[in-house]
Regions:
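Iron-sulfur cluster-binding electron-transfer modules in prokaryotic oxidoreductases
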Residues: 1-315
C-alpha cells in the first residue's frame, strides 16, 4: 500500500501496457472468444473479469503539452479553472467499441475551451490521488496522506483557492470534499451547470438518452443538478426505475462481476423497451459496469454537453 502510494505514476505506467495487451487480444480474438477465455480464467485463478466495455490505455501527457504549446493570452480570474483528471481517467481511455472518439480528458479540455476557459493542470498530477483506492482497501493513513498531497498541489495550482477545482470522477470528488476543506471543488455536472450555462448555447436533442445518477452524486445532493443538466441537452431523459447503486463499488466490479450484474439486473429490459442506444453518468468505473450490463454504451455526461452545445457568441 505505502509502496504503491509512493510510486503511483510508475504503477499507472505498468497498468497501461496491461490494458493495451488486453485490447490487442480483443482485436485479435473478438469479443466472444475473449469473454469466454477470461471468464474461464476468472473462475479458475481469480483474474479480473474482462468485458467488451473494458477501456484502452490512455496517457494525458499529449493534451497537457498541447495546452502549454497553444496557451494564448491569459484569461481573467473568473475564466480560469484547475482541472485534476482522476487517476482512472489518466489511465483508462475509451472502450474499443465506444461510440465516442476522444478520451474524457481530451473532451473535458475541448468543452472548457469552447466555454472560453483557461485550464491549469496541477504539477506532477500523474503522482496525485484523492486516496479512495487506499481507503477502500482499509488503509486510511495512506489514503489521508495521498489526500494531503493532493490538497497541497491543488492549493498551489489554484493560487490558494482563487480558482475553482474540477475533478472528472464523482466518487473521487466525494472523498475530496470530505478531506479538502479550503477549496471550491466540483465534478463535471455541477461545474457545467453552475459556470458554463451562460457561456454555451444549448441545442437539445430529441433523441432519448438514459441517465445514471451515481451513489456519490446522491450523497453530495447533486442528483437534481445532473438531471437538470441532462434535460438542457435532451428533451427525452430516462432514469431507469429500481436501479440504484450499480454495484461496481470501486474496483470490485472487475473482481466480483456477479455483484454488478445482480445490481443492474433490471436495467437492460427498460433500456430495450425505451429503444435507447446511449447512456450517461459521471464515473468511469460505473460506466464500465453499466455498459456491460445494459447492452448500450454509457459515457460521461461531458460528451452529451459537448455534443449539444455551441460556443455562445458575444453580442
Amino acid at each position: 500500500g505505502v509502496f504503491a502510494a509512493n510510486h503511483f505514476s510508475e504503477i499507472k505506467n505498468v497498468l497501461r501496457p496491461v490494458l493495451t495487451l488486453a485490447d490487442t487480444a480483443h482485436a485479435l480474438l473478438g469479443s466472444g472468444v475473449m469473454s469466454t477465455l477470461t471468464k474461464s480464467m476468472h473462475h479458475a485463478i481469480g483474474v479480473p473479469q474482462w468485458t467488451p466495455a473494458m477501456p484502452k490505455a490512455y496517457n494525458p501527457e499529449s493534451v497537457k503539452k498541447e495546452i502549454i504549446q497553444k496557451s494564448t493570452q491569459p484569461q481573467p480570474e473568473n475564466l480560469k479553472v484547475v482541472y485534476f483528471p482522476s487517476c482512472i481517467n489518466q489511465t483508462m481511455g475509451l472502450a474499443r467499441k465506444s461510440p465516442e472518439e476522444q478520451p474524457l480528458v481530451n473532451k473535458m479540455v475541448s468543452l472548457l475551451h469552447k466555454a472560453g476557459y483557461e485550464i491549469i493542470f496541477p504539477d506532477k498530477m500523474e503522482n496525485l490521488c484523492c486516496g479512495t483506492i487506499w481507503e477502500s482497501k482499509g488503509m486510511p493513513d495512506v489514503a489521508d496522506s495521498k489526500a494531503a498531497e493532493l490538497e497541497t498541489a491543488l492549493l498551489q495550482a489554484s493560487e490558494n483557492g482563487k480558482y475553482p477545482v474540477l475533478c472528472d470522477q464523482s466518487p473521487c470528488l466525494y472523498r475530496m470534499r470530505h478531506t479538502i476543506k479550503q477549496l471550491r471543488l466540483y465534478e463535471p455536472a455541477e461545474f457545467i451547470y453552475t459556470f458554463l450555462q451562460d457561456k454555451l448555447e444549448f441545442r437539445p436533442t430529441d433523441k432519448p438518452i438514459a441517465l445514471h445518477i451515481t451513489c456519490s452524486m446522491k450523497k453530495m445532493g447533486l442528483g437534481d443538478q445532473i438531471t437538470a443538466l441532462a434535460r438542457l441537452c435532451s428533451n427525452n431523459v430516462f432514469i431507469p426505475e429500481e436501479v440504484g447503486c450499480c454495484g461496481f463499488a470501486g474496483d470490485k466490479g472487475f473482481t466480483h462481476p456477479e455483484v454488478n450484474a445482480y445490481a443492474l439486473r433490471k436495467l437492460k429490459p427498460q433500456i430495450e423497451k425505451k429503444h435507447i442506444d446511449i447512456g450517461y453518468s459521471n464515473s468511469r468505473t460505473c460506466e464500465i459496469g453499466l455498459t456491460t450490463n445494459s447492452g448500450i454504451a454509457y459515457v460521461s455526461i461531458v460528451y452529451l454537453v459537448d455534443q449539444c452545445t455551441l460556443k455562445k457568441e458575444k453580442i
